[in-house]
Amino acid sequence: MKKYILSLDQGTTSSRAILFNKKGEIVHSAQKEFTQHFPKPGWVEHNAQEIWGSILAVIATCLSEADVKPEQIAGIGITNQRETAVVWDKTTGKPIYNAIVWQSRQTAEICDELKEKGYSEMVREKTGLLIDAYFSGTKVKWILDNVEGAREKAENGDLLFGTIDTWLVWKLSGGKAHVTDYSNASRTLMFNIHDLQWDDELLDMLTVPKSMLPEVRPSSEVYGETIDYHFFGQNVPIAGVAGDQQAALFGQACFGEGMAKNTYGTGCFMLMNTGEKAVASEHGLLTTIAWGIDGKVNYALEGSIFVAGSAIQWLRDGMRMFKDASESEVYASRVESTDGVYVVPAFVGLGTPYWDSEVRGAMFGVTRGTTKEHFIRATLESLAYQTKDVLCAMEADSGIELKTLRVDGGAVKNNFLMKFQSDILDVPVERPVINETTALGAAYLAGLAVGYWKNQDEIKEQWHMDKRFEPTMEAETSEELYAGWKKAIEATKAFK
């Protein structure tokens, strides 16, 4: 009896295996961290073999601790840190260099050169992205240009490229399936999101041979099976793949046009489903593919906030204002307001809609009466203001007014933050019972492909709300507070 779906969530700092049942509930999970490599300032790399080892380890731990047999698994879904690039030898199956992580800035110079050559507009039109070291394309070029003999091997068809999903499917299937899904392909800077093909003009710009690239498939489909020696003698269908933020949008059941979710992790990622049309952004958002399913492709607008949960960690570890992140809510609730204090947590620059990597964090409105409580509250409020910045851009680009915002991620446990978020946006904020929406989204995609769940309507009914936060703040007050934030942003940008 096929009782479960196994979701593999390969993140930036750890790998997780999560078993879900028919109701979309977590049966068991296992997690394993792996090493971060920083060869030079601003560079971030992972050992792809170590990632693969961590995946095998969490699968084994999860199944044995849950006392679940491999033959009880109906299918495997994979979700992954996006943009991180792996290049490996087709014959030996070994990576020729470390995986270059999405956060890594080692290709910034390549990006500057491409911008100087005037490629920005063409890239934006075809991919919906900006030329930035964040995306996979320049990472692949860097590996081919800097690893001895790599370019020659690539030209001869001996090397393969993949984002982490591709690497894991390739390994699980014993090298039989070299595939990715639409959502991951749309983050590479090499994929045309309108005609759904690898784009020759983009590949020429990056000097990447087409033979390296995986086949692009829908996000919910059987791509292959596990090879028995990697999966306890069983051939289990590998049936769903999506990048982490898109998987969270699916896990939140944001299937309708205009539905949006915000994930509060280290940073924040807000995605709005724009249906079957790619909406070009005039306000600093990315246009991306949400997923491909049932012969259709859904698009999304995406906003990135670089610092969110990490600002709370900074209060805890850097400023030593409390011992546990949950205490931030207690302190923030002790004061009626920030008393005019604003914190702009631009520790690594500002993301959407400003895209300014030069600015740094700042604090405004401090008086002799400012206390620790004001400071903590102002830092928490900054997450809500940044989210409003992104939402304003989304509404302007899409022409869609948001009805409710679904939220997930570590910081959503903070009731003060969620209530303030609702007040500042003037829309209800909904927190689900199951917060593991990324892994759940991948499980749903896999389950649909193997018939474990019938359709998206069945999934929609499984979304249950833990708490709904309604806006109660006077419009005049919230507008005044937000105007103060915009002033703080301008002042921060002026100080460089």
From Swiss-Prot:
The phosphoenolpyruvate-dependent sugar phosphotransferase system (PTS), including enzyme I, and histidine-containing protein (HPr) are required for the phosphorylation, which leads to the activation of the enzyme. Glycerol binds at R82, E83, Y134, D244, Q245. Activated by phosphorylation and inhibited by fructose 1,6-bisphosphate (FBP). It catalyses: glycerol + ATP = sn-glycerol 3-phosphate + ADP + H(+). PROSITE patterns: FGGY_KINASES_1, FGGY_KINASES_2. ATP binds at T12, T13, S14, T266, G309, Q313, G410. This is Glycerol kinase. It comes from Bacillus cereus (strain AH187). The gene is glpK.
